Regions:
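Accessory, non-catalytic peripheral segments of nucleic-acid enzymes
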Residues: 3, 42, 219-337
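Core catalytic region of metal-dependent phosphoesterases/phosphodiesterases
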Residues: 4-5, 14, 18-118, 173-177
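Structural motif
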Residues: 6-8, 47, 122-123, 145, ...
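Divalent metal-coordination and catalytic microenvironments
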Residues: 13, 33, 48, 53, ...
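Active-site environment of divalent metal-dependent phosphoester hydrolases
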Residues: 15-19, 56-59, 85-96, 132-134, ...
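Conserved catalytic scaffold of divalent metal-dependent phosphoesterases
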Residues: 69, 87-172, 197-200, 221
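Short, conserved loop/helix-junction motifs that constitute active-site signature segments
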Residues: 76-79, 139-142, 171-176, 250-252, ...
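Conserved beta-sheet core of the metallophosphoesterase superfamily
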Residues: 159-223
Length: 337
């Protein structure tokens, strides 16, 4: 049996349409693809693999987002290489079956293949987002590599939250293979034979200070090599003194920053700081968080609006990506406290 590839470029969890179909986020996706396609060519890869969550919203697809999606697929197709996609949970309309997906039109591209069910080829097994009790079949896999979109307990969902064990698939169920590469959790992490390769780029403040995102190059039989996209958006949480001492180190036109006020300042001073940081460094977002629980956040240069810390917490809850937590219920519980 011949190997599926000699050298593969692997990426995951692009989430086109995130941030309510933000144009800036879509532009970041386009910039990522510029970098990724150059990496594919530089590394002389013969295969491209995508491990799920091409789109973000599972029940609708914005026209502008779809336009960017098709353009990205067209660029991948034009590589002239074999490109294989599996759907993640965000790509599926139903939670209990894989019959409807927002990436079905991938099949119209000559060089791109959509793998909707477990499939083994060339000693590689592809496993899309698992449904129901499909996880029970994972122990039977004996391939050298598994490429999947798994939700495994004891791994970090983000830098702060570990996935609890709710039953279902466990890492031990995949011990029959040499190495597992998976999407779903966005933080790059390795434990045993399981590699969460990390998503394309940081998406929100759950990714603060965690810039190890980008893509993986896998030469058959060799250790994977991870490449960071150094021009990615970045999220920072820091205090005011820290920011003012070395703003050039922390702020640029790719930065989203939440700044804790560790000294007392007036609204006028806050306006001045925000205006100067925006003018000098072009930061995308700068929120000043006061100890008493108010947030000074920028709507326009020179204006200070208020946002509650509660909104920040609720935003973090809504960003949890797992089928085992009911985020609406968590938000209701938090609001009742």
């Amino acid at each position: 049996m011949s190997n599926l590839f000699k050298k593969a470029a692997v990426f995951t969890d692009l989430h086109l349409g995130y941030k309510q179909n933000s144009q800036l986020f879509l532009n970041d996706c386009d910039r990522f693809m510029d970098w990724f396609l150059n990496l594919v060519k530089t590394e002389e890869c013969d295969t491209v693999l995508f491990l799920g969550d091409f789109h973000d919203t599972r029940n609708s697809l914005n026209i502008n987002t779809m336009d960017h999606s098709i353009r990205i697929l067209d660029r991948l197709n034009n590589l002239g290489l074999r490109v294989l996609f599996i759907p993640g949970n965000h790509d599926l309309y139903h939670k209990d079956r894989r019959t409807v997906t927002s990436i079905r039109y991938i099949e119209k591209f000559k060089n791109i293949e959509l793998i909707m069910d477990q499939h083994t080829e060339g000693d590689v097994t592809f496993v899309p987002w698992l449904i129901g009790e499909e996880y029970k079949n994972m122990r039977k896999i004996k391939s050298k590599y598994v490429m999947g979109h798994f939700e495994l307990p004891s791994f970090l969902m983000n830098a702060r939250v570990e996935m609890p064990d709710h039953g279902g698939l466990k890492a031990d169920d995949l011990n029959g293979v040499d190495t597992v590469f998976t999407g779903h959790f966005h933080k790059r992490q390795i434990k045993g034979n399981v590699h969460y390769i990390g998503n394309a780029f940081p998406h929100n403040y759950a990714d603060a200070w965690d810039d190890e995102r980008g893509a993986m190059i896998l030469q058959w039989g060799a250790d994977p090599v991870y490449h960071n996209w150094t021009s990615a958006p970045r999220y920072r949480t820091l205090n005011l003194i820290q920011m003012l001492e070395s703003p050039e180190e922390h702020l640029d036109d790719r930065t989203y920053a939440r700044v804790q006020l560790d000294v007392s300042i007036s609204y006028e001073e806050a306006n001045f700081i925000k205006e100067e940081m925006q003018k000098t460094y072009g930061v995308r977002e700068l929120s000043l968080i006061q100890h008493r629980g108010e947030v000074l956040t920028e709507n326009a240069i020179g204006d200070v609006a208020f946002e509650s810390v509660d909104q920040i917490v609720l935003s973090q809850i809504s960003n949890l990506d797992t089928q085992h937590y009911d985020t609406r219920l968590l938000m209701e519980i938090y609001n009742s406290l």
